[in-house]
Each structure stands twice: as C-alpha cells, then as structure tokens.
Amino acid sequence: MHCRPDGDHDRRLARCHEPAPLLLWPLRLERTERPRRASCVDVHGLPPLEMPTFLLCVKPELEGLVSFEPGEGCDWKLDFKQSAGSEERKGVVVDPQNEEEVPNAKGDTCQLVMKFDKKDKVAATLSVVAVKGVLRAFTSEDTVAVPIAAFECRGLEPIGWTPTGPYVVRTAGGVAYNVGAEGEDLAEDWCDYDEKSGESVSVDASIQFEFRLHKG
C-alpha cells in the first residue's frame, strides 16, 4: 500500500525544483574623456571652448611679377576689437617667433596675450597658426584675395592689417625681390627694374585685404 504525500510535502518538493531567481546587478558605464585640444583653455573651471581661426586674405596689385608672399622675419601689424565688448586696439605688432604662456593653461603658448582693460579678469590671446592646404602665395593668376596667414583667437577679433616688410615677390623668370624692410610699413609703392626681363616690376602699396573665418 502506497501512501500519498500530503499537500505540504508537494509544495516543498515543488519549491526545491524552482529555478533560482536571476540577480541583476546595475551596469556601471565608464565615461570616456575626449582629449583636450592644446589650444583650448579652461578658465575658472569652465569647459574648453573652440577658438575661431581667422584667415588674412590679400589681393595686391602686381606689375611684372607672378607671386607675392610673406618673407622671413615678417611681423603682423593688426587692429583688434574685443569679442565680447566694444573696445579696440590698433597697430598691435604680432611676432610669429614670440612665445608667451597662455594664462591658466599648463604648457600652452601663444604669440600674443593682451587685455583691452586692466580690469579684465581674462586676457585675450592670439596664436599664429599654419593651416595646411589653405595658406599660400598670391599669384598673378588669382582674381580674388587668397589667404596668406591664419590667426587663432580668443577674446579678440582682427579687423585691420597694415602691411609691414619684408615680403617676397618673384618674376616669371624666377628672380626674387624683398619688398619692404623688416618691421617697416609699406607706406609707398615699391618698384624696381628686372634686368633679366628688361621690364619694370612693382607692388602697389594699397593692398586689398579681408579677414575670413576659417571653417575647416
């Protein structure tokens, strides 16, 4: 004679064969930090900002010449306006070889640090940069202004340019001339006589220019 298990026994047996509950642990996501650009500066804990780059585009009037470009030792004499204000500074000379520490940025350097007002908490900065595939010499075949220099700016914008020497110009025969002495304004037209071609060569002192925001 077989004895039938009571109800309590059946329930205990059923519980023994139930699958163990699945434990779900919270998934921890690690945030990946994006690398900081050396040209971006943290000021008072603010996140890094992208700094705009302005291109100096020129269209000189050439006679008997095929190209015009900055020479070695050429400084940039610029006028600036305050990005977040109305202050302006004129005739500021920027030396591409000069290096100054960027405020509140470890190891970063630039070519110009300036304040429009002594009360400004944060200084404006400018770096002379090389934009590959964009900057080049102006040629006699160009019909519009071309970019010959680039400036990465924070807190200021370039609004004016005074050409200062030296610049290098070339003839079709490959003869090169320096236009203007180092650090001197091109206040007058430059002219010379090219013996190889037997023709006069010249650069008009009134050089058309404009600043364009680089969208690279």
PLM region spans:
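Eukaryotic proteins' extreme N-terminal regulatory segments
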Residues: 45-77
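Compositionally biased, low-complexity segments enriched in small residues
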Residues: 5-6, 28, 35
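Structured domain cores in non-transmembrane regions
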Residues: 65-77, 81-160
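Glycine-rich, aromatic-bearing surface loops/beta-hairpins
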Residues: 149-216
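Intrinsic-disorder-associated, low-complexity terminal segments enriched in Asp/Asn/His/Tyr and depleted
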Residues: 2, 8-10, 42
